[in-house]
């Protein structure tokens, strides 16, 4: 039953307590999955990506340097492998042609054979991409191409099948009006579809577009949003704009053709850690330090669709690309089954709402009685005058 339920989850979220949470938005349920059976902060999930089997497998990068394999078909972990080397947590995770790609804070990018999940053999490739990495991102159209960037670590594009030198190395923007050097802090990266262009968001609230095919290595477009560091960026389904989130829970859509602000989304209360748009539907999934997963509709009518409190601080997410969200079969519940402690529902909030509705008529009756008493008190005074 757990395996069948896991198959239909719409969003997968990695937490600071080492729990992988699967959320079914149609049923308004969230289920917890751990490899050891207990939450452990030393296994905090810092990166997620789909495995070689598409959405039937999830690769879970943990703070202790392990990458776990989770089957969405069976609803359980199927093994793990150690990926040592470098310092810090995983800043990116990807797979291509049976190999696993990892990158950590200290700038060590490694490619591992993924045939034996329990093995801890030496990597088949190691690249030093520079310290202070904030993000490693794979190009969906060319899986052997990855991009890296971080704090005082400018954007670079690497070919894992080519040389150990980057294909593209971004150049910093010109000095500011005081002739002072502009600091570099790339927080997140995305590849634009059907082109070689990339978009980054920075810790200095800038959105920049780079074109490796152009002669210049500086950004071909730059826009700014707000006053706080931008922490995450995702492409909209059309590919002409991006949505960015910052450390104060603000979300905004930026047009990549003109660099102007298209609109904002409300509802978040903490730093944004993960953003992802559905590939075909106008939906945006977001998570962060306020421990709430939110699904926004990004096209008219723009607004909040779903909101799920998940108890732990949320670090990253994966949004299913399925189109048949509403058409999935409702599987029958087993009779007299005690709900699992790992399943979180909105029953409490539903009961509170129902109680509030029951109290509403009593409140109206009380208001009516008070108004009747006031009219009775006013009548003697009005006749005497």
From Swiss-Prot:
Subunit structure: Isoform 1 interacts (through WDR repeats) with NVL; the interaction is independent of RNA or pre-60S ribosome particles. Isoform 2 does not interact with NVL. Interacts with MTREX; the interaction dissociation in a late stage of rRNA synthesis is required for appropriate maturation of pre-60S particles and depends on the ATPase activity of NVL.
Pfam family of the protein (one): WD40
Stretch forming the signal peptide: none
Positions of region (Disordered): 323-385
Domain of life: Eukaryota
GO cellular component, one term: nucleus
UniProt protein name: WD repeat-containing protein 74
Protein's cellular compartments: Nucleus, Nucleolus; Nucleus
Major localisation: nucleus
Lineage: Eukaryota, Metazoa, Chordata, Craniata, Vertebrata
Keywords of this entry: Methylation, Nucleus, Phosphoprotein, Repeat, WD repeat
InterPro entries noted in UniProt: WD40/YVTN_repeat-like_dom_sf, WD40_repeat_dom_sf, WD40_rpt, WDR74/Nsa1
Disulfide-bonded cysteines: none
